[in-house]
């Protein structure tokens, strides 16, 4: 079989023009095509398009960097605000605790004062009740003594003794 391939290869003739085979003509055509492209300024246009694209990408990168810086600035600002809010909340909590303690102390003092006032009022009522009871007992004793004295005087005095007492009272008024 190798002999058959060799026989076929001997009979094939490569076409040539002006003594140049197809590979050389393709290379020449390619060089001419590339020359025309260079002559028309295609590489400059491609370079301009690439430069424009590079500029756009650089601009986008710059904007992205600025956005990143803005975001970091906002983040720092909000972290500071958050820290301030936490500090203010702690201060408010401390003030509320102090106010609550002051209110508790005031309530205790008010309760103690109220208890003392009520105790004093109760003691005053008891003293008044004792004084009233003592006055009633004295009045009853005076009334009983008066009634007993009146009864004794009525039993022991007669009209003559009454006349002598009246005369004596008139005489003491007249002297006076």
UniProtKB/Swiss-Prot annotation:
This is ATP synthase subunit b. InterPro entries: ATP_synth_b/b'su_bac/chlpt, ATP_synthase_B_chain. Its main location: membrane. It comes from the Bacteria. The lineage of its organism: Bacteria, Pseudomonadati, Pseudomonadota, Alphaproteobacteria, Sphingomonadales. F-type ATPases have 2 components, F(1) - the catalytic core - and F(0) - the membrane proton channel. F(1) has five subunits: alpha(3), beta(3), gamma(1), delta(1), epsilon(1). F(0) has three main subunits: a(1), b(2) and c(10-14). The alpha and beta chains form an alternating ring which encloses part of the gamma chain. F(1) is attached to F(0) by a central stalk formed by the gamma and epsilon chains, while a peripheral stalk is formed by the delta and b chains. The chain crosses the membrane at residues 18-38. It comes from Sphingopyxis alaskensis (strain DSM 13593 / LMG 18877 / RB2256). Belongs to the ATPase B chain family.
């Amino acid at each position: 079989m190798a002999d058959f391939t060799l026989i076929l290869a001997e009979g094939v003739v490569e076409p040539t023009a002006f003594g140049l085979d197809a590979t050389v003509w393709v290379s020449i055509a390619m060089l001419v095509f590339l020359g025309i492209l260079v002559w028309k300024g295609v590489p400059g246009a491609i370079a301009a398009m690439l430069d424009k694209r590079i500029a756009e990408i650089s601009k986008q990168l710059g904007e992205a960097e600025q956005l990143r810086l803005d975001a970091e600035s906002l983040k720092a600002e909000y972290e500071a605000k958050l820290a301030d809010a936490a500090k203010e909340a702690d201060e408010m909590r401390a003030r509320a605790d102090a106010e609550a303690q002051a209110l508790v102390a005031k309530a205790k003092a008010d309760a103690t004062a109220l208890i003392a006032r009520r105790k004093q009022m109760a003691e005053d009522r008891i003293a008044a009740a004792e004084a009233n009871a003592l006055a009633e007992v004295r009045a009853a004793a005076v009334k009983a003594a008066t009634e007993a004295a009146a009864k004794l005087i009525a039993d022991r005095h007669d009209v003559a003794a009454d006349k002598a007492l009246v005369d004596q009272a008139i005489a003491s008024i007249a002297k006076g």
